[in-house]
Amino acid sequence: MDFHSVLKMAAAKPGSDGIAKRYSLAVGPPKKDPKVKGVDSAAVQAFLRKKDEESRRKETVEKRKKEDLLAKRKELKHDRKARAMASRTKDNFKGYNGIPIEEKPRKRKRSGTEEDQNDNMAAEGEEYMTEEELYEYSQSESEQEEEEELPPQKVPKPAPGKKPPTPALNFNDLLRLAERKQYEPVEVVRPVKKEERLRTAEELKELEFLERKAQKADRKDPKRNEQLVKVSKGSGDKYSSLKGTHSGNSKSSSTEQNGTIRKSSSDTGSRTEKSGSVFHTKESKKPSSAKDLGGKGSRPNVTGDGKDRHSSSQPSAASNSAFGRPSGSARPSGSSGPGRPLGGSGSSSGKSTGGSASGSARSVGGSGSGSGKPMGGSGSGKPIGGLHSSHGSGKPTGGTGSGSGKPTGASGSGSGKPTGSSGSAKSVRESGSGSRSVRESGSGSRSVRESGSGSGSARSVRESGSGSGSARSVRESGSGSGSARSVRESGSAKQAGGPGSGRALGSGSSFARPSSNSSPAPGKPAAGSGSARPSSSGTPRSSSMGHSTSNSSRQPSSSGAVRPSSGPPTGATPKGPSPRPGAGPTSVRPNSTSVPGSARSSLGSGPGRPVAASATGQLAPAKPKCTVVAETISSKNFVPKSINGHMNGIRTAAPPGHRPAMRPPGPPLPPITSSYKRRIDDDDDYDSEMDDFIDDGGECQDEISKHIREIFGYDRTKYRDESDYALRYMESTFREQQKEEARSLRLGIQEDLEELQREEEELKRKAKQLKAAKKMSR
């Protein structure tokens, strides 16, 4: 069946409608209503109406503004003219509307008036113009200026808020302040030691180098150094600077490297001495001073290396007096004699406590040389307890013992040291007569005095070997508490007879320093087993840790009693707050390091003992007086070195003749060994990108350096074995380079001239040869 017949059949079927269905090709109506042009809907018309109104309103506002501005401008113009005229008549013209017009640009105005004076003849119009010009600048700003002017007026008010510097205290105020401060505990700030990463050898070398550099700078500029070092109680410090002793007191903090800050409060500050009256300071009250890390209640802090350092707690008085006193004058112990030159006359320095100034013997307390000051309680050699009066100062130096008076070795005159009762306070007085107290002069054997009381085994061993300059002060603090024995070395210095002979200061005899053990002393708290013995002898020995306790315990009672015996000379016992650990007069400088002349007691745990009581006093006999610089250096240097000695509790003292001050500061340089040598590390230069670099060999280095050596005479292996450290010092400075350049320039010019001369000679020679040749040819 073909398609045609099928269609026919379908059409013929009765069920089918007659209309064939087709897809309409007509386009349907649009989905959106078409816009009708020219017709505004009501909403649109309302919107347009609103817009028109707004624009009209804006215009009116602008018009009004414009009118206001024009009116203002007109007014200002008139004002300006009127003001220009008014300024000529010096009227105070307030604007027409009553608002004063700010005349800000004063300078401009002045220049305008000057112009007026210069050109009196100028036309008025011109003058107005100048005024207008003047004003034109300020007109636009005039309103701003009025607003700006107000704030400046407010600004000045805060400025007065700064308080004017407080007026300097006068001396009496300082004394009062010192009295008040001496009982206040001082906080000791323990340095926080944080773990540092291990450093490479290179870094260590660098640090060492920088340290040395800084120390050199300090040596050159001691004053700056002192300022850094001075951590003094406020008042003490001011006072000390008044006295001019500051150089000394700054010293005490020398061991700052160890990290504990020693308060070098100048003893002067606290040594408030009201002419005659004696103030008793209660040492015991100063817990801080006693504060000691060692665990013994009073032991001064022991820094890591075992060095007792009398931490800052030291009462201000103590430290300064000890070393604060300029070498020239030993202020006898403590304040009493500040002005008195030690060396002065043997007698003066020898002032015996008893007041017998005879000869050079210096009673313990009055350290003629300043170093003799008895330490802490024994302060003036006065027995610490109440006895001080009886045998303390009263005891004539020579007197064997008005005290308990057992003259141990030296016939009565020698040492009248009452051992028994005062026990620790035994003031060993050197007899005024000059006999050496233990007086075994030639033998040099030491007489050992045991102080009677059991607890205090402080025996002051006085090595009187007359000749032995180096009597070594060995102070082992036995148990640490009781037995600190102060070995006093009378050293050669103790030559009784010659006031000048022994001590550099010229006080003839060495000082007897009472080695008072604090414990036995009646006045002393039991705890004070540590001896407060001043180690003032020729080499201040820092007492071993043992006496640590004495520090704090430093006799409270004694405090009252202790009067520096030096007092007698002045007539009133100066009341240095002697009870201070430093026993006012004696300064306890824990580091004896500062003592220049004497062997430095190894940083002594100084607390109890005035180390080096007179910093200058103890110079080795022959040495010149110590200078500020030397003291500064000596005080700072030795900290690191004596560590070993401290650990064992043994203080090693250098012989008195030896001046530590001369040693260069800083830890000793390690020898330059092969470990320092520079190494050429090829690995450091390795670069992975260079692996495929083709090296065609080139000339070998030795070949090249051989030529260089021939031409310039330079050997490149010359410094191969030098350390970086050494090479650092070979670098030339800019000035040296310039000199070198000038020199080479001179040489270059010279060589050029010689070259020119040679060339001229060559030319002449050639000319001659030519002439000769011509003649020959003819």
Swiss-Prot record:
Compositional bias annotation for Gly residues: 336-357, 365-384, 395-417
Organism taxonomic ancestry: Eukaryota, Metazoa, Chordata, Craniata, Vertebrata
Statement: the UniProt record of this protein carries the keyword Nucleus: yes
Record family assignment: Belongs to the SPT2 family.
Entry-linked Pfam families: SPT2 (PF08243), SPT2_N (PF22878)
Biased composition (Pro residues): 153-167, 662-671
Residue numbers spanned by region Important for interaction with DNA: 1-665
Known partners and oligomeric status: Interacts with histones. Interacts with a heterotetrameric complex formed by histone H3 and H4, especially when the histone tetramer is not bound to DNA.
Biased amino acid composition, Low complexity: 312-335, 385-394, 418-493, 506-559
Reported function: Histone chaperone that stabilizes pre-existing histone tetramers and regulates replication-independent histone exchange on chromatin. Required for normal chromatin refolding in the coding region of transcribed genes, and for the suppression of spurious transcription. Binds DNA and histones and promotes nucleosome assembly (in vitro). Facilitates formation of tetrameric histone complexes containing histone H3 and H4. Modulates RNA polymerase 1-mediated transcription. Binds DNA, with a preference for branched DNA species, such as Y-form DNA and Holliday junction DNA.
InterPro entries according to UniProt: Chromatin_SPT2, SPT2_N
Chain intervals with Acidic residues compositional bias: 114-135
Region (Important for interaction with histones): 666-778
Gene Ontology biological-process entries: heterochromatin formation; nucleosome assembly; regulation of DNA-templated transcription
Predominant location: nucleus
Record localization: Nucleus, Nucleolus
Disulphide bridges, residue numbers: none
Organism of this sequence: Xenopus tropicalis (Western clawed frog)
Keyword Nucleus carried by entry: yes
Any one GO CC term of the record: nucleolus
Record SMART domains: SPT2
Name used for this protein in its record: Protein SPT2 homolog
Comment field on protein domains: The acidic C-terminal domain mediates interaction with histone H3/H4 complexes.
Sequence ranges of Polar residues compositional bias: 242-269, 588-604
